[in-house]
Amino acid sequence: MAIQTRKMSDWLAQNGAAITAAAKTSMLKAVNDEVAQLQDGVFIMTHRWKTYTDDFPLAIEPRKWVASYQNAGEIADGVLLVEGGHHLVIAPTETQLPWAGGNSDTGAFRTGDRLAAMQDWAGKDNTAKIIAASKTGAVTNTEAYAAGFCNKYSRVNGNGKGLTAGRWWLPSVAELMMIYANKAKINHALSLIDGAQQLSESWYWASTESGSSSAWFLSLTGGTLDGWSDKSYSGKVRPVSAFLR
């Protein structure tokens, strides 16, 4: 059977009512406003509230993030990293804490295999399981321990909106590796945020476990990944989140 073809111009001439009229400038603006959030890159995330009161989340290129935003009371949620179909919001600040108060079987992703650990993207799910497994002798759910600290972390604007407590987690190994690979760009964006702390040349905890007494640890100095770090050891903790309304 022959395939029938038709000129688009002829179809438009007969079906003009089916086409929504839009000014070229409006269409270009809409496309340009959205495309930056779809492409790989590093952005500063905020929930606007000063000029607009809708608390809408925005991803702003670092070169467009100016002091006047913060002087007007805007708060940066963190640094948005988009890469290869994954995205993370890296908190502006960090702390140093033990992973847990003792040996724990949390149900979070556990492996002693380095390659398997590097494929773990389930930081959010890991954190929820770590917190749920908290118990006497192996506390994990308070701000004194890595997962609990991340879960209680919060960044909000003047309306109390933003990335509130319960929306942050302890990154998995794969999430930490993505942060490490983009450390210089992330630190540049962090340098533009008032009160932010840059990623340091230190060991950072992952939510990926390697045993009941150990979890994975990533060095942001050279990318060394250690799977036998005792959970009682005090390491760097940097909460992460997602681009959320």
Task: Name what the model sees in each region.
Residues 2-164, 231-245:
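Short, compositionally biased
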Residues 89, 168-171:
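Hydrophobic core segments of beta-strands in well-ordered, beta-rich domains
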